[in-house]
């Protein structure tokens, strides 16, 4: 087994877990019980320059089953294959499902690294608890995922921008109709080799900011990575594309508070009303997904100590006014898939608001963040955020 990766302290669950009366005797998720079955029919490889995100999958997958009476069964790594689910499986009817998005990188030194995997494990744990899926040991799950990555490490393409995208997923599998806690679940992980998101350089996106559509609201599940948050975004996304925009800028409330962009967190670098240079992003108030890239940008920028870094609310009125007054330096989205994504224009209430792009296709800060994160992910800079696993 690979060396254990330690996790930082995490929040205790705030919701009850489905359990039999003999809770203490239920089996916990245990990576030492992991068994590995090697495929005898390797999957077809795709030339890395022809990879389409999320369309190609590696040879193996991880599966961890849970049952209310027994707890967690021994985890397995086996050949990638279809799942067998009953038509009555609760996940198919009530969206009792959550997932993660994380990556493994082949570094400039040919060693394999993850990027802040403890944050992904913590978020998956919190998403699971919020959806009344069973508790699990984050350290043990990370050990299992690490073994899966090592098993399929030959699927990780070399080169900056390339990676193996990891998709841990937790679903309720109980076979009955009725809204309630699932008496069984499946936690699995599949891997997809990914090409460079920007194969020919940055491509700024245009956004549709339409207050008619709301992504999340107080007391909801906007801070979880549940599939229930993504399906309702597809129609507004199609409306944005019909108006020539690539993404939706999600707004909330009567004052059109800015929240997220597409499936990414949002940042704005500007001169605020007090005349200060400030990097600002919406706060984690329960409506915002706590992105790993988001947290990394906040941590890095605060470490530079070159300008003010704030996690606070702001609205489209402030953005529009600042753009018209020339106080916005740049805006960008941040997420696992793209790392950072420059914003070039916002369509809002009949106006086309142009966002500065100092370097032609991105802002200077956007480019700096992208470079610094890549240097960590690919090992050019040794950092605790990028543990070497192989």
From Swiss-Prot:
Q: Does the keyword Transferase apply?
A: yes
Question: Which keywords does this Swiss-Prot/TrEMBL entry list?
Answer: Amino-acid biosynthesis, Aminotransferase, Branched-chain amino acid biosynthesis, Pyridoxal phosphate, Transferase
> Which top-rank group of organisms is this from?
Eukaryota
Where on the chain is N6-(pyridoxal phosphate)lysine found, per UniProt?
A: 225
NAD listed as a keyword: no
Q: Write down the top EC class of this protein.
A: transferase
Catalyses:
L-leucine + 2-oxoglutarate = 4-methyl-2-oxopentanoate + L-glutamate; L-isoleucine + 2-oxoglutarate = (S)-3-methyl-2-oxopentanoate + L-glutamate; L-valine + 2-oxoglutarate = 3-methyl-2-oxobutanoate + L-glutamate
Q: Which cofactor does it need?
A: pyridoxal 5'-phosphate
**EC number(s) stated in the UniProt entry for this protein:** 2.6.1.42
CDD domains with a match to the protein in the record? BCAT_beta_family
- What Pfam families is this protein classified in? Aminotran_4 (PF01063)
Please provide, alphabetically and separated by semicolons, the GO molecular function terms listed in this UniProt record: branched-chain-amino-acid transaminase activity; L-isoleucine-2-oxoglutarate transaminase activity; L-leucine-2-oxoglutarate transaminase activity; L-valine-2-oxoglutarate transaminase activity
Among the GO biological process terms of this entry, one is: L-valine biosynthetic process
State the protein's purpose: Catalyzes the first reaction in the catabolism of the essential branched chain amino acids leucine, isoleucine, and valine.
Q: What's the family?
A: Belongs to the class-IV pyridoxal-phosphate-dependent aminotransferase family.
Subunit info?
Answer: Homodimer.
Q: What is this protein called?
A: Branched-chain-amino-acid aminotransferase
